[in-house]
Amino acid sequence: MDPRLSAVRQTCCCFNVRIATTALAIYHVIMSVLLFIEHSVEVAHGKASCKLSQMGYLRIADLISSFLLIAMLFIISLSLLIGVVKNREKYLLPFLSLQVMDYLLCLLTLLGSYIELPAYLKLASRSRASPSKFPLMTLQLLDFCLSILTLCSSYMEVPTYLNFKSMNHMNYLPSQEDMPHNQFIKMMIIFSIAFITVLIFKVYMFKCVWRCYRFIKCMNSVEEKRNSKMLQKVVLPSYEEALSLPSKTPEGGPAPPPYSEV
């Protein structure tokens, strides 16, 4: 193996970086599809913030931008998958940028969460206009699972944009009046531990993608260097150039026969 490739670690915490990055890309592609389906269902069911009858130009623009955001996230995730499969390191850069921005937003959310407890820890029932065919507990469980999957991905801040709310986390944080002070403190401790665990997981994901990027880049550079060292094809000289070349006949040896046309 080339020394440059051996210098780049191909594992991250006992996992191969290419396999881990491929699994991460597939996971985010699936998350993009799930977010698109969920938002489409909310719009189709006439959610309060998405009613077409009460929608002006501003709300139409918000609706279009939300679907464009999901499409952009899908393209970034698909670019990561194609880059790993086809060894194109440049295709990994958009996802790396997304991971950096997501980590900074998660860190700011953690710091702001010490004011009030985030809403996704409280499984409150959603108000629905029509009776649902599914049990309420099942819907709560599915919503909670989707929230956990979104939290562990690089799309944590996406539901905030899709809710058409201003970018202020205090708008959707619950009030401390609904629970006792001791219970609120316990929930804050549990939330902090879980959120720090998620941040560590996000750092691990970034480390896997970064090492995969370095490995693919080194592998491509070694391949280009190897191809450049290949012997180039020698072009035979023309007849006039061959005549102008010095004779290679040894002294005293027989001369070559003269050129004659047939």
From Swiss-Prot:
Summary of the function given for this chain in its UniProt record: May have a special functional role during embryogenesis and in adult hematopoietic cells.
A GO CC term assigned to this protein in UniProt: cytosol
GO process annotations (BP): cellular response to leukemia inhibitory factor; defense response to tumor cell; Golgi to lysosome transport; induction of programmed cell death; intrinsic apoptotic signaling pathway; negative regulation of activated T cell proliferation; negative regulation of autophagic cell death; negative regulation of B cell activation
This protein's UniProt keywords: Lysosome, Membrane, Phosphoprotein, Transmembrane, Transmembrane helix, Transport
Post-translational modification Phosphotyrosine, affected residues: Y259
Chain ranges passing through the membrane: 19-39, 64-84, 92-112, 134-154, 184-204
Subunit description: Binds to ubiquitin.
Main location (coarse class): membrane
Positions in coiled-coil regions: none
InterPro entries: LAPTM4/5, LAPTM_4A/5, LAPTM_transporter
Organism per entry: Pongo abelii
Cellular localization per UniProt: Lysosome membrane
Family assignment from sequence similarity: Belongs to the LAPTM4/LAPTM5 transporter family.
Protein name: Lysosomal-associated transmembrane protein 5
Membrane topology: Multi-pass membrane protein
